[in-house]
């Protein structure tokens, strides 16, 4: 059997040597960065694949070692700009656990609400960039982005998270506007979901990730759940206010592991997040006024320790290994990011896939390039 090699460029990697440039459109986050795929082809079928990362290294982990803990929260959302709030929140939760800090109840519910809004906006971009018919949903996403900007001051990088809570509360008018936008999204989502599902059925059986491969690689989030791995930290761990919302957490799972299954799971988690966000907003209204952070010393020092924290972000499970020697900066803060494993899973799933299905295969693994090379 005679095979040939092909180097595929994604995003800014098109400026390097390449045999094929894969254009995913201006909207898809995988296009914002640089990634190469080294493919082995037999006629028009992929028989081998290797993801070449390292072209957009964010140096986040090294920068953390030279920043104090407050400054780290301002940097923590830079490597995955799609899951920005969840990224800074995961770091804050890890620091708080190491210091024994318990945020106020209003802060916990506000964080839960913002985390679900972040999950919705991330999912909507991945859905809206999938097929042209789904782009109409991006108008609703734009309204959610404007609400985030009103609440945090940052459209892309919220930077509202503080050690022990949030920088400012979410006011009643903001909660009312959020309810209006979520109602609009609930109304428009079924038609968009149908358009995406119909378009992706053409790729049934392509880029299949088996359950065993998903487990061995350590994939999480919607990619893992589309391969039969029923894991979700919101349901399985006592994080934020999720234990009180347990009855509302319906985790969509599929066993097919192919392109349509991944989009099915991604679409399925949006209504769940809408329900959780609405429930969190109702609870905040019931709580009324109250503090959203705790007093901190001028210099924050984490006691000498090694600790590990996790959070379920829009793309999957993020892990934070914090090693402190009692100084105002960490000795090491290592990130375990979902995009890194998702790209490894992409390479594992491609053999047997027609080259014509490469673009939807890549977009169905839901990654941000900066989150790979952090």
Which residues are covered by each model-predicted region?
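Active-site bordering "gate/hinge" segments
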Residues: 1-374
């Amino acid at each position: 059997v005679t095979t040939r090699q092909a180097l595929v460029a994604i995003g800014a990697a098109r400026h390097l040597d390449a045999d094929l440039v894969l254009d995913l459109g201006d909207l898809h986050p995988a296009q914002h960065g640089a990634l190469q795929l080294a493919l082995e082809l037999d006629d028009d079928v992929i028989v081998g694949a290797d993801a070449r990362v390292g072209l957009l290294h964010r140096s986040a982990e090294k920068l953390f070692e030279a920043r104090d803990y407050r400054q780290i929260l301002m940097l923590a959302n830079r490597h995955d700009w799609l899951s920005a709030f969840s990224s800074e929140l995961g770091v804050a939760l890890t620091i708080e656990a190491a210091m024994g800090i318990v945020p106020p109840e209003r802060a916990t519910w506000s964080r839960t609400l913002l985390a679900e809004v972040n999950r919705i906006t991330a999912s909507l971009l991945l859905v809206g960039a999938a097929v042209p018919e789904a782009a109409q949903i991006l108008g609703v996403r734009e309204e959610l982005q404007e609400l985030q900007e009103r609440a945090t001051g940052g459209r892309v990088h919220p930077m509202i998270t503080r050690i022990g809570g949030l920088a400012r509360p979410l006011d009643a008018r903001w909660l009312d506007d959020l309810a209006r936008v979520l109602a609009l999204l609930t109304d428009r989502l079924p038609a968009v979901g149908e358009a995406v599902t119909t378009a992706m059925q053409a790729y049934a059986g392509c880029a299949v990730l088996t359950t065993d491969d998903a487990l061995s690689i350590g994939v999480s989030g919607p990619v893992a759940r589309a391969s039969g791995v029923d894991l979700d930290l919101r349901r399985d761990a006592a994080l934020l206010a999720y234990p009180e919302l347990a009855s509302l957490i319906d985790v969509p799972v599929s066993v097919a592991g192919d392109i349509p299954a991944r989009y099915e799971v991604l679409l399925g988690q949006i209504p769940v997040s809408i329900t959780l966000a609405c429930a969190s907003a109702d609870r905040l209204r019931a709580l009324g006024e109250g503090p959203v952070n705790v007093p901190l010393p001028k210099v924050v020092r984490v006691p000498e320790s090694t600790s590990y924290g996790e959070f379920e972000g829009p793309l999957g499970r993020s892990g934070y290994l914090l090693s402190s020697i009692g100084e105002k900066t960490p000795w090491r803060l290592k990130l375990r990011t979902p995009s890194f494993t998702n790209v490894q899973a992409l390479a594992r799933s491609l053999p047997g896939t027609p080259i014509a299905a490469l673009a939807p295969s890549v977009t169905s693994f839901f990654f941000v390039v900066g989150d790979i090379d952090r």
